[in-house]
Every structure is written in structure tokens, then in C-alpha cells.
Regions:
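Histidine-dependent nucleotide/RNA phosphoesterase domain, centered on the 2H-phosphoesterase fold
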Residues: 1-179
Length: 179
């Protein structure tokens, strides 16, 4: 049986993707593997490798898990180094803690039998690029990336996605609308 690499995401509106891609141009010379604009998203839950035969059941369970959720807002406020500024791994677009997103994460993970902390606040982020560690460490002067950018978006659905080609291509398997 073939395995698929599956995750649940919140899509980013194209207008926000465009704005983010315009912002990161100033850092293009850094040793960073930048994400393609079309792949920008918020990961709700990484499910992992599963047999393709169980994908329809996963999609159905996630649809059921999110069926009672109302659309909600997420506020973003900065582009910064993360998760630790002293030893960064990524450059990300960071949001403010969001209880509703934490509940959504919990509902998805509980319905799939994954561990989840109860109603944790969830700080959303969008990975913009992954730092190439060896080249980064050789930089004579490390950049201080902390750019304020206030953007709010509405979450009205989640999608079950398949990642192919080492994360170079994402395929939507199911869109699950919120109420």
C-alpha cells in the first residue's frame, strides 16, 4: 500500500501571499530556502505518513471535527526569526495567540486519536523560509529580522493536504468548511 504525507492546513488568501512575497525580497540574498508563494499556509496539524486507503476516512473525520466551528479571525503582527532568535531555524510570519485556533487544533488531533493539550492557545505562523544552517553560521553579521506587519485574515475552512516531492508540491485532498 502506498503512503501519503498528510497535514491539515489553513490556506492563506492570495492577496496576503503576494504581500508576504513582496516583503521577503529584501532578504533574498540570505542563506535561506524560501517557500514558494503558492505553498504558504498555516499548519493546523501534521498527521504524517499514512496508507492511502485511510485518507478518505481521515477527510471524513476532519470534516466532522470542524463542522461546528464558526469562522474566526487570525491577527498577524510580524515577520521574524524563529522559533528562537539566538538559534533560528526559520523565518516566519507570526500571529497573535488564538484560543479558537487552539480549539480547532485540539478537535482535529482528538478526532484522529493524536495527542493534544487541552485548549492550548495557539500562536499561528507561516513559514516563509528555512535557514541553511551551515551557511547562516558563516555570516559575518547576522541579520536582525523583526519587521512589524499587521494583517488580519478570516479562517472559514481547513484543508487536508498531501505533501509531495519533499514539500515542494502540496495537493488539496479535501476542503472542510467552517460554519
Amino acid at each position: 500500500m502506498q503512503k501519503k504525507k498528510i497535514f491539515v492546513e489553513i490556506g492563506i488568501p492570495s492577496s496576503i501571499k503576494k504581500r508576504l512575497m513582496q516583503k521577503i525580497v529584501q532578504w533574498k540574498e540570505l542563506p535561506v530556502k524560501w517557500m514558494k508563494g503558492e505553498n504558504l499556509h498555516i499548519t493546523v496539524s501534521f498527521i504524517g505518513y499514512v496508507d492511502e486507503s485511510v485518507v478518505p476516512e481521515i477527510c471524513q473525520k476532519i470534516n466532522e471535527a470542524v463542522a461546528d466551528f464558526e469562522a474566526f479571525e487570525i491577527a498577524f503582527d510580524s515577520i521574524e526569526l524563529g522559533p528562537n532568535v539566538d538559534d533560528p531555524k526559520i523565518i516566519w510570519f507570526c500571529g497573535k495567540s488564538n484560543k479558537e485556533l487552539g480549539k480547532l487544533n485540539e478537535a482535529v488531533e482528538q478526532t484522529l486519536g493524536m495527542r493534544s493539550q487541552k485548549h492550548k492557545e495557539y500562536r499561528p505562523h507561516v513559514t516563509l523560509g528555512r535557514i541553511r544552517k551551515l551557511k547562516w553560521e558563516k555570516l559575518s553579521e547576522k541579520p536582525n529580522i523583526n519587521e512589524k506587519i499587521n494583517i488580519t485574515m478570516t479562517v472559514d475552512s481547513v484543508s487536508v493536504m498531501e505533501s509531495k516531492g519533499g514539500g515542494a508540491e502540496y495537493i488539496s485532498l479535501e476542503e472542510c468548511p467552517l460554519v
